[in-house]
Amino acid sequence: MTTEAMETTTGKVLWRSTYVTDYVDSFGFDNGPRAVPAVADGRVFTYGPEGRVTALDLNTGRELWSYDTASALASPQGFFGRAPSPLVQGGRVIIAAGGSREGQDAGLVALEATTGKPAWTAVPDEAGYASPVAVGDHQILAWMRNRLWLVSAADGRILSSQPLRSRMDASVNAATPLPCGQGRWLVSAGYGVGAHLFRLEEGKIHPLWQRADLLDCHYATPVMVGWQIYGFHGRQETGMTLRCISPEGSIRWEAKEKLDGGTLIAVGSKLLILTEDGELRLLNATPEAQDLIATWQILRAGHRSHAAYASGIFYARDSEHLVAIRLR
């Protein structure tokens, strides 16, 4: 697996860090990586599909330490390899490994950011594909294979949990929990799970509502703009539609066109959508109706890598190309 640092304006490679992995996707898709790197305090933290966590120096790419969740925690590969992105909080790197360590639960593991040494392990659950998220400075919310967990960031102590998964074994939880204001969090998946809204209060997870037909996000995490939620509804195999819903659980609008899937980014009052067919779509985020401004074909079809946006530049890649587009 290779991690590269590039100049934003030219694409010039500043450094490259590579390690050898024998990971092969069980279903014949690309061999990763899946997880988005985390950057904090002069370090870059990566999590490879084979289970290796690596810390790199941000300026040079020099490897500082690595930790193998497969050997240390018996972290299983799952359907598509390890995919949750690292979370850096309180000087530690939180990984949804879904394993166990010397008889102890290790669904989550916290590694010291400076050394890679385990600080704590917790949660008796397998990993899904959603990434753990910070709730303030002291708590972590993690949607795993079987349950939604709220734990203490200091020691991994379980504060609260809720059962939340499909009845189908061949299912995935991929969309990361979305904060919706006032302590509310939206969690969504396909395979009959649908949309669930929870309130986190005093260290507890309180269910507010659940609707199976409102928004079932197969892969992409939805976004929130102006107190409205925008996301893809439906399975990738049968086609997805873009929907706008309210945090109260009503559908504001649904696009007529079906897509194979894609990812969403909110920038101000705009939505940037990259479809699996390699098309970039720019929309106004409005609850009245879908308001498509423009489309551009920027990549070849057949990819699922999440796009990124920073300082006016939109970044996207497929298996062969990385493109940077300045948006005005």
State each model region's role.
Residues 1-328:
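Noncatalytic, solvent-exposed loop/strand surfaces
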